Regions:
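Active-site helical microenvironments for divalent-metal-assisted chemistry
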Residues: 1-187
Length: 187
């Protein structure tokens, strides 16, 4: 890849470092989209032995690129995001991806299509981990930062996404226990 094109891509992706998510970190600072994506990819890295028949390199690639559309629209919490918001983000992302050099434009387009279809083991795993990471981060954030709706949401979020995997179902149960303990402690 031509160095200046790589720099252009990286300058766009850098926006995710400044794009803040709805959730706080354990120290009470807003989490960035880049931080979420990094830890999501780290989760996939450490779970490769649990999913030996899954192309974990592909899952990690999905994790790394999944929120790039938020470079253009910012982060909108899932419970506030409308179909119009999703369409706008998808359109801006598609426009950006189409301007990437080959073969990256085709690879990213194929990954996004696979992620949206949620038909492959890789796409389903990426989506489940994406949602689980969000709940883990909420469990790590001060409870004073939670919205009232998040008390129930954090107990059920991702349940349907993990159902395909006994391991993820067990992980979700452990995360739910952490949520219940956090609510019980009130911290």
């Amino acid at each position: 890849m031509e160095p200046n094109k790589l720099l252009d891509i990286l300058h766009t992706a850098e926006r995710l470092k400044d794009t803040l998510r709805h959730c706080d970190t354990s120290k009470g600072r807003r989490e960035s989209v880049a931080e979420h994506s990094w830890r999501l990819a780290l989760m996939a890295f450490f779970l490769r032995d649990e999913f030996p028949d899954t192309d974990m390199d592909r899952v990690i690639r999905m994790c790394l690129i999944h929120d790039l559309g938020e470079c253009f629209t910012g982060d909108i919490p899932s419970f506030l995001k409308t179909d119009a918001d999703t369409e706008k983000e998808d359109s801006l992302l598609e426009q950006w991806v189409s301007g990437l050099p080959a073969p990256y434009n085709a690879e990213m387009s194929a990954l996004y299509a696979e992620m949206n279809a949620l038909q492959t083991p890789e796409a389903r795993l990426y989506k489940a981990l994406d949602k689980l990471e969000a709940v883990i981060q909420h469990n790590e954030s001060p409870i004073a930062t939670w919205l009232p709706r998040e008390y129930d949401l954090n107990l059920t979020y991702a349940n349907e996404n993990v159902a395909f995997s006994p391991y993820l179902t067990e992980l979700r149960a452990a995360i739910r226990r952490d949520t219940e303990e956090k609510i019980q402690r009130g911290e």
